[in-house]
């Protein structure tokens, strides 16, 4: 249910409830999916929220997605891998003229996000208002319903066009008749654990799109090749090692995605797919760029990322319509000159290869928009790159480049330039002529200064110059009115110039690991600054003018020279995160209560003698770290800590705290409690009130027992009691929880201890004299047990002793574990001087310990 109690996803999309039993009847679900069951928004559109941390190559996808949303078109795939081919306008393409020559490639785009990310979307659900039985646009979504069989009841819905069965356990299509689902055009079977594509697939004659990614399919059946209307076939993340013969039957196929399989070669028959526009073969085991790939006349996008290809064939020049070539993470040592005969290439990804040089013929790439040459062995870039006048993104990081060509100034459309971790000593002035540059990254070089002419790059928004040899803050950057992100970590800057006060538009500033000795007053003029990192400098005080920094949300001052908490910080009323760890703070001022919005506070590795109770006034605090790996140790956690009712994460590790406050249970929001390497011997009973606690770390303490009801912490997922006197946590911790492995371990441990105790009883029974056994009975208070046992006159002594010990164990089982009884028996044997028996028991213990190890 949504937060408001409705059965609707955010954005207005219907939410399906889970089936009670896998494989149960789905007619109710079909009724729920029916447009007649509920009134739904007729203008539902596809929603997407890609991560901001994407490659530059995703920019074109983002803009196309925006256009798509403006048109209210949608995506039929409820979830697909972000590295797969993402459909952008299925509805539009399938409702076109109906011709088999439909140009679906325009509705698809190969997305190059970091591999492994998941793209979550929702099915298109438009045109439902007024839908009747004559409609040919019905969608059924049965994702993650626990289905084990194909839902044959689906045939009750006559006009199913899009069917989604992702994340079930469907293995076959039994029960489907040839006449059923004749109108089905899209079928998605992601994550069903399929070992093969069901042969019944051939019955869906009108199928145009099949997505069977994330299964365990090892081969493509010939029956699939009979689906002549197939436009798009997605089989990513399976175990396919060969392509079948007969591919020529899929003559209308436009998209073939076989990423993350086990293909070692590409058959010549692939060249028969004359309408293929998008081919994804990323992360297979290809060692050769097959010539058959070169004779796909309509191929627009080719992804060979993550293979072991060492060279390109001359025939690559035949790919006249190729616009996007992805060959990152291969073994290319050179580029065949024929590749520079591709007139339409717009994106070329060659990162993480072994290229030593780029041919001057790169000048032929007049349409090139993106060039990624990261992680190669390049020492220079050809001057002719200046002829790539449409280039927008150039990435050269992690090479051995010493300088950029002066003619780079001609790249008037360049928006992003990444030259991190090379061998550059100077930043050429020619960069100042890049009038459209937005992002400039030169981190990890040996640059000593930034030319003043940089001020001419008026559109720059982000500059990164970390870990260079810059001694003076580049004043040219202060004139850039669009600059909002600036990072100068790991340089030798000792002061901030007055010009900095003019950069009022700056939002993010990093200057950690420099030589600053004061918090410059010029920084106080940055009234829009939200993030400031001054860690690992030599700052001792904070000026009062910091109160002018009204937008500051994150302030990092760790590893400086503060000997007292600067009261001036307490004027930052919008501060959310403060890190002032690794200093020499001894106390916290009362004024800290003025930080009304503080959420995260790191005070670790200072020299507090007592826990600063002033912190307990922070009603909005969610994370507190006051751990100590060096210096003075805290010995007490005050009861006032319970006042921080919003606290979610508390870290008091590496101190000398002995007791946890009795009212700790009042921290009802606590999710993680880190208290390793202290001197804690027990937890108070109120600890059981921490109902949302998920992580508990009590390593290296003096814990001898845990509250018996700790199993009531139903949210607990991670526990660590290593290096405590506990033999093991009590069984109650794990019973009924999701820690089945621990439960099994504890059960086996109990069984093992029981067997060891029985062996010890046998040793005692077969070794002790009758006189000594009488003494042993007295020490163990078991005389009554032995005397009340029915013993036959002929029963051997060792049998009588063994039965007496078993009876004693039965009486004590409720109170003591097998291990405790063993220790109790061992002490009693020592009292009566039965040293020979003790030696035998010790030998047994050593033997069992060795076996366990």
Curated annotation (Swiss-Prot):
- What SMART domains does the record point to? LRR_BAC (SM00364), LRR_SD22 (SM00365), LRR_TYP (SM00369)
LRR repeats by residue range: 133-157, 159-180, 183-204, 206-227, 229-251, 252-274, 275-297, 298-319, 321-342, 344-365, 367-388, 390-411, 413-435, 436-457, 459-481, 482-503, 505-527, 528-549, 551-573, 574-596, 597-618, 620-641, 646-668, 669-690, 692-713, 715-736
All copies of the Death domain together span: 757-845
Composition bias, Polar residues: 56-65
Keywords, comma-separated and alphabetical? Leucine-rich repeat, Repeat
Alphabetized SUPFAM superfamilies for the sequence = L domain-like
In its keyword annotation, does this UniProt entry include Glycoprotein?
Answer: no
Region: Disordered; residue ranges are 1-78
Protein's UniProt keywords contain Repeat:
yes
Feature: compositional bias, Acidic residues: 19-31
* Pfam families associated with the record: Death_Lrrd1, LRR_14, LRR_8
Task: Name the InterPro entries on file.
Answer: DD_LRRD1, Leu-rich_rpt, Leu-rich_rpt_typical-subtyp, LRR_dom_sf, LRR_domain-containing, LRR_R13L4/SHOC2-like
- The protein depicted here goes by the name Leucine-rich repeat and death domain-containing protein 1
The top of its lineage is: Eukaryota, Metazoa, Chordata, Craniata, Vertebrata
């Amino acid at each position: 249910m949504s937060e408001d109690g409705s059965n609707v996803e955010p954005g207005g999309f219907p939410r399906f409830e889970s089936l009670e039993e896998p494989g149960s009847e789905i007619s109710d679900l079909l009724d729920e999916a029916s447009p007649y069951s509920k009134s739904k928004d007729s203008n539902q559109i596809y929603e997407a929220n890609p991560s901001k941390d994407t490659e530059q190559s995703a920019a074109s996808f983002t803009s196309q997605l925006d256009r798509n949303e403006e048109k209210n078109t949608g995506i039929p795939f409820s979830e697909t891998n972000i590295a797969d081919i993402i459909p952008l306008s299925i509805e539009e393409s399938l409702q076109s003229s109906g011709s088999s020559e439909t140009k679906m490639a325009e509705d698809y785009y190969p997305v190059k996000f970091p591999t492994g990310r998941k793209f979550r979307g929702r099915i298109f659900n438009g045109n439902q208002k007024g839908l009747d039985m004559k409609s040919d646009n019905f969608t059924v979504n049965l994702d993650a319903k626990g289905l084990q069989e194909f839902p044959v009841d689906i045939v009750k819905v006559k006009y199913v066009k899009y069917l989604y069965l992702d994340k079930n356990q469907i293995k076959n299509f039994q029960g489907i008749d040839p006449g059923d689902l004749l109108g089905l055009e899209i079928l998605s079977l992601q994550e069903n654990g399929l070992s093969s594509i069901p042969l019944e697939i051939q019955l869906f004659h009108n199928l145009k799109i099949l997505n069977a990614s994330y299964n365990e399919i090892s081969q493509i059946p010939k029956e699939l090749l009979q689906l002549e209307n197939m436009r798009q076939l997605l089989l990513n993340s399976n175990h396919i090692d060969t392509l079948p013969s007969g591919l020529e039957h899929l003559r209308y196929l436009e998209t073939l995605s076989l990423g993350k399989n086990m293909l070692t070669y590409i058959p010549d028959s692939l060249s028969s797919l004359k309408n293929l526009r998008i081919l994804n073969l990323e992360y297979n085991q290809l060692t050769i760029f097959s010539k058959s790939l070169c004779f796909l006349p309509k191929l627009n996008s080719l992804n060979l990322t993550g293979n072991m290809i060492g060279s390109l064939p001359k025939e690559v020049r035949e790919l006249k319509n190729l616009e996007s070539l992805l060959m990152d993470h291969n073994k290319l040592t050179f580029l065949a000159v024929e590749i520079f005969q591709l007139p339409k290439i717009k994106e070329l990804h060659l990162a993480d290869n072994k290229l030593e040089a780029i041919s001057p013929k790169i000048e032929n790439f007049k349409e090139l928009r993106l060039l990624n040459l990261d992680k190669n062995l390049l020492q220079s870039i050809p001057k002719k790159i200046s002829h790539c006048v449409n280039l927008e993104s150039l990435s050269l990081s992690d090479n051995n480049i010493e300088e950029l060509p002066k003619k780079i100034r001609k790249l008037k459309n360049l928006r992003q330039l990444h030259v991190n971790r090379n061998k550059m000593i100077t930043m050429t002035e020619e960069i100042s002529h890049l009038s459209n540059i937005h992002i400039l990254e030169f981190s990890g070089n040996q640059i000593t200064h930034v030319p003043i002419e940089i001020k001419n790059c008026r559109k720059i928004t982000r500059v990164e110059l970390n870990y260079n040899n810059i001694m003076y803050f580049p004043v040219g950057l202060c004139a850039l009115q669009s600059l909002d992100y600036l990072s100068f970590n790991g340089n030798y800057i000792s002061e901030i110039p007055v010009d900095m006060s003019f950069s009022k538009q700056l939002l993010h500033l990093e200057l950690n690991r420099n030589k600053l000795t004061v918090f410059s007053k010029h920084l106080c003029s940055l009234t829009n600054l939200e993030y400031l990192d001054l860690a690992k400098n030599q700052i001792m005080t904070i000026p009062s003018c910091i109160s002018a920094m009204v937008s500051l949300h994150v302030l990092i001052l760790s590893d400086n020279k503060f000997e007292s908490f600067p009261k001036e910080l307490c004027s930052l009323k919008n501060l959310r995160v403060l890190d002032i760890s690794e200093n020499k703070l001894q106390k916290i001022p009362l004024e800290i209560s003025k930080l009304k919005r503080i959420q995260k506070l790191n005070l670790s590795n200072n020299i507090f003698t007592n826990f600063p109770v002033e912190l307990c006034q922070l009603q909005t605090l969610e994370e507190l770290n006051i751990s100590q790996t060096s210096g003075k140790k805290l010995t007490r956690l005050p009861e006032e800590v319970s006042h921080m009712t919003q606290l979610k994460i508390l870290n008091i590790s590496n101190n000398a705290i002995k007791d946890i406050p009795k009212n700790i249970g009042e921290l009802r929001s606590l999710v993680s409690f880190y208290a390793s390497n202290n001197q804690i011997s027990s937890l108070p009973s109120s600890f059981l009130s921490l109902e949302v606690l998920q992580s508990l770390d009590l390593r290296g303490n003096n814990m001898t027992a845990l509250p018996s009801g700790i199993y009531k912490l139903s949210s607990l997922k991670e526990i660590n009691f290593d290096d405590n006197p506990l033999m093991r946590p009590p069984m109650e911790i794990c019973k009924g929880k999701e820690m089945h492995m621990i439960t099994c371990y504890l059960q086996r441990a109990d069984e093992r201890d029981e067997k060891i105790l029985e062996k010890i009883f046998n040793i005692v029974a077969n070794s002790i004299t009758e006189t000594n056994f009488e003494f042993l009975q007295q020490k163990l208070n078991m005389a009554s047990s032995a005397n009340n046992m029915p013993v036959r006159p002929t029963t051997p002594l060792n049998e009588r002793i063994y039965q007496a010990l078993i009876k004693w164990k039965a009486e004590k089982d409720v109170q003591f574990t097998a291990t405790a009884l063993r220790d109790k028996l061992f002490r009693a044997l020592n009292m009566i001087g039965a040293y020979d028996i003790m030696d035998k028991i010790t030998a047994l213990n050593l033997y069992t310990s060795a076996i366990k190890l």
